[in-house]
């Protein structure tokens, strides 16, 4: 868009049969389906936020996911609501002490697999209820069979804020990402189903 506005000749080539890459949305019975997984736009940069709002109206979606472990609902990412539900702790200091106590009881100096790595970071309670099942489903393997380097850190927040992102602005385009990208590409030549590397 900016290159076209500056008077440049532009060509967008996409190997796929549609624009928008991994943020492509397709209307299915008046519902915008994110074909490559949900994407939530988020930024703390007001200039960026104002820019994308030139091409799309955004809803006020705030990502506040929860996890269901055997009928128990926990807030994600791990925060004080999670720790209160797990252990009945109320203050960040109590939660930090509980995590340190659990990590010390397990004490893994050199994690050999993902399970050991996760427990060394957040202790067995959080791992068992909120990491193990999800990770094994995602990778299709037991956590003990996965390398430790997959998890370098696990986000832990010692606040009662359930917002997944810390950014000031977030949302999803009301008409979908594809419509937003169409507006950005207005007047730009687009070639679909073209493999740039083969031609």
Residue ranges and their predicted role:
Residues 13-15, 43-44, 175, 192-194:
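Short His-Asn-centered micro-motif
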Residues 29-105:
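Dinucleotide-binding Rossmann-like beta1-alpha1 core, especially the glycine-rich loop
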């Amino acid at each position: 868009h900016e290159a076209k506005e500056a008077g440049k000749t532009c060509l967008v080539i996409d190997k796929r049969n549609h624009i928008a890459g991994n943020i492509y949305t397709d209307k299915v019975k008046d519902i915008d389906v994110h074909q490559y997984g949900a994407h939530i736009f988020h930024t703390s940069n007001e200039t960026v936020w104002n820019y994308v709002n030139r091409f799309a109206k955004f809803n006020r979606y705030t990502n506040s996911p929860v996890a269901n472990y055997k009928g128990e609902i926990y807030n994600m990412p791990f925060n004080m609501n999670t720790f209160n539900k797990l252990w009945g702790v109320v203050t960040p200091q109590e939660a930090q002490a509980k995590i340190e106590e659990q990590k010390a009881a397990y004490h893994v100096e050199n994690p050999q697999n993902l399970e050991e790595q996760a427990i060394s970071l957040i202790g067995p309670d959080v791992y068992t209820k909120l990491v193990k099942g999800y990770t094994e489903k995602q990778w299709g393997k037991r956590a003990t069979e996965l390398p430790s380097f997959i998890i370098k850190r696990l986000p832990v927040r010692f606040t009662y804020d359930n917002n997944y992102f810390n950014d000031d602005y977030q949302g999803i385009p009301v008409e979908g990402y594809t419509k937003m990208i169409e507006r950005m590409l207005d007047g730009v030549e687009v070639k679909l189903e073209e493999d740039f590397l083969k031609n």
